[in-house]
């Protein structure tokens, strides 16, 4: 699975890169992947799989998916 960490979310992975390859044994809820990556839920505003926004609590991902996480935006 290819995972994109948007914005400051790169700091939640050791390599501090915007993209990472991870492998999962079979279909998992996206929430379980977030747990494995140790990203606090409040830090993710949007989760997308293969370019479509999804509900991480109910969406099953596979090893062939491309996942993107985006933090909340700031500004005015």
Q: How should each PLM-predicted stretch be described?
A:
Residues 1-75:
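Ubiquitin-like/PB1-type beta-grasp interaction modules and other compact soluble beta-rich domains
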């Amino acid at each position: 699975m290819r995972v994109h960490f948007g914005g400051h979310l790169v700091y939640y992975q050791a390599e501090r890169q915007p993209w990472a390859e991870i492998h999962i044994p079979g279909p998992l809820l996206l929430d379980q992947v977030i747990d494995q990556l140790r990203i606090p839920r409040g830090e993710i505003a949007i989760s997308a799989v293969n370019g479509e926004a999804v509900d991480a609590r109910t969406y099953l991902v596979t090893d062939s998916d491309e996942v993107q996480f985006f933090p909340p935006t700031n500004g005015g």
